A protein has these predicted regions:
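N-terminal acidic leader/helix
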Residues: 5-30
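Acidic, low-complexity intrinsically disordered segments
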Residues: 36-79
Length: 79
């Protein structure tokens, strides 16, 4: 499960990503280039030892940016 929440009231443009209801990480978007990067890795990804959810979130945010569809929140579940 992965939840994305748009960042408000900040100089950063991007999303908080929340994997498996744990502490969030941050995905940032460079508005000039469209580059999407992992700014802060979530605690869950750190415990896993690799940025699984960060990379998932990064890919989703890039797709949303390319389509210029940037909702305030988005939820994903897979099984």
């Amino acid at each position: 499960m992965l939840k994305l929440i748009k960042i408000f009231n900040s100089n950063s443009k991007g999303y908080w990503y929340i994997p498996e209801n744990s502490a969030p990480g941050m995905i940032e978007i460079d508005e000039k280039t469209g580059e999407v990067k992992i700014a802060i890795e979530s605690t869950y990804d750190k415990e896993l030892g690799y940025p699984y959810f960060a990379n998932k979130a990064k890919g989703i945010v890039k797709q949303m940016w390319d389509k210029q569809e940037l909702p305030d929140e988005k939820f994903f579940a897979w099984g």
